[in-house]
């Protein structure tokens, strides 16, 4: 079979999509208690206010589970967040590579990830096009979490009605009063390893910073389902008596061999459970080969700015700006492709050829959220909203 020459001119096909989310308003019902409660608000409690608008409480008619960092830590050996939470009620998880590293997914009460609203400090994390959640873009993010709340069924979320499946609200670590530094390393099956370095300056003159860098790699259980991921987290805080301002930057870069196709052949399923059809092709001698670079490559960075203010014993406000930028591609070896489908000319009079292509994503997501909380001994009133915009660019590139 003839193929395109290795030095063939690159050709790109682009399409642009723009999404503008509707402005959403959420308004909580009045809640009443039989007796007045003492005001226990302290300066350090402002760190919890940031996510109060999306967190369920004891008196809310919502089924939920709270998970603290101390509960996650013993399990945090390199696997993604869905796998770390698979012991929770009604949670079922899957993993492409077979060992919980790389692409992982979560279902709650049968609802898939597109029906689970995920927020990071109250900021939407779901992909704006598919509504899916790709934790592979945040390697070792569990090391930077302070608390996680999983709400099963209809819940509270800044993302609105899409939360009918479940809501996963994650809060990152807040400021640490004392300076610290830590190094963490773990190794496991299938050549899996995780290396983490973290430090914090401690609180000095109302300022504090903490950061983390991580590397996770694995060969995977499935054939060639390797992963190599880098993640980072940075948090800067200003703490005053009635105010808190925090800036966060976090994200990651991943390269994972594609393993999302599954097995349709019953014989393969019974006798070769690790078989991976990704990248498979037949060479000129009729032998089955696998393309070495059938990989997914993507990086994503998140930036958040939060401001919390306690105006009085009854009024507290929260506001946040956020921006997420991501770009990447997955590479594929394709056999017997029609060159006209790519707007490419015939090669030596032949319109059918093998080729290697990259399918690119280039995304920007930004917006703002706010909430205003009025609370007395018998009343807890919350008003807030969010406005977001998403810009997505898709295009293809023939590289061989």
Task: Give names to the regions the model predicted.
Residues 46-78, 105:
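N-terminal periplasmic "start-of-domain" segments of outer-membrane beta-barrel proteins
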Residues 47, 104, 164-166, 179-181, ...:
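Hydrophobic, lipid-facing positions within transmembrane beta-strands of outer-membrane proteins
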Residues 81-84, 104-107, 119, 135-140, ...:
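N-terminal periplasmic accessory domains that precede
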Residues 82-124, 146:
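Extracytoplasmic beta-strand/coil segments of soluble accessory domains associated
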Residues 124-152:
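Short acidic/polar hinge/loop motifs at secondary-structure boundaries
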Residues 187-217, 222-259, 298, 303-312:
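Transmembrane beta-barrel wall of Gram-negative outer-membrane proteins
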Residues 237, 244-304, 330-357:
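Acidic/polar loop-and-plug regions of large Gram-negative outer-membrane beta-barrel proteins
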Residues 298-400:
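Face-selective signature of the C-terminal outer-membrane beta-barrel domain
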């Amino acid at each position: 079979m003839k193929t395109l020459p290795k030095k063939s001119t690159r050709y790109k096909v682009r399409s642009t999509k723009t999404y503008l989310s509707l402005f959403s308003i959420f308004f909580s019902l009045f809640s009443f208690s039989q007796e007045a409660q003492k005001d226990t608000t302290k300066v350090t409690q402002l760190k919890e206010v940031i996510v109060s608008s999306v967190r369920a409480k004891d008196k809310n008619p919502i089924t939920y589970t709270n998970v603290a960092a101390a509960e996650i830590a013993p399990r945090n050996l390199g696997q993604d967040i869905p796998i770390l939470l698979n012991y929770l009620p009604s949670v079922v998880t899957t993993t492409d590579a077979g060992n919980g590293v790389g692409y992982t997914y979560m279902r709650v009460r049968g609802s898939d990830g597109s029906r689970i609203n995920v927020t990071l400090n109250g900021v939407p994390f779901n992909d704006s096009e598919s509504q899916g959640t790709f934790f592979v873009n945040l390697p070792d993010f569990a090391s930077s979490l302070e608390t996680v709340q999983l709400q099963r069924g209809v819940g509270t979320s800044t993302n609105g009605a899409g939360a009918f499946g479940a809501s996963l609200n994650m809060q990152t670590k807040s400021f640490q009063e004392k300076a610290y530094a830590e190094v963490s390393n773990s190794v496991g099956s299938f050549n899996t390893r995780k290396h983490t370095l973290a430090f914090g300056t401690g609180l000095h003159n109302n300022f504090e910073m903490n950061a983390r860098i991580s590397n996770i790699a694995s060969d995977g259980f499935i054939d060639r389902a390797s992963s190599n991921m880098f993640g980072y987290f940075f948090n800067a805080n200003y703490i005053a008596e009635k105010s808190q301002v925090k800036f966060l930057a976090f994200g990651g870069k991943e390269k994972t061999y594609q393993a999302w196709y599954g097995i349709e052949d019953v014989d393969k399923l019974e006798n070769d459970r690790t078989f991976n059809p990704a990248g498979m092709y037949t060479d000129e001698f009729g032998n089955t080969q696998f393309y070495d670079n059938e990989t997914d490559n993507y990086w994503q960075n998140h930036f958040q700015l939060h401001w919390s203010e306690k105006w009085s014993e009854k009024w507290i406000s929260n506001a946040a700006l956020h921006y997420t930028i991501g770009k990447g591609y997955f590479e594929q070896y394709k056999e017997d492709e029609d060159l006209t489908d790519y707007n490419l000319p015939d090669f030596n009079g032949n319109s059918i050829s093998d080729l290697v292509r990259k399918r690119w994503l280039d995304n920007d997501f930004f917006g703002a959220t706010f909430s205003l909380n009025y609370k007395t001994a018998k009343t807890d009133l919350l008003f807030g909203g969010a406005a977001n915009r998403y810009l997505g660019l898709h295009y293809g590139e023939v590289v061989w």
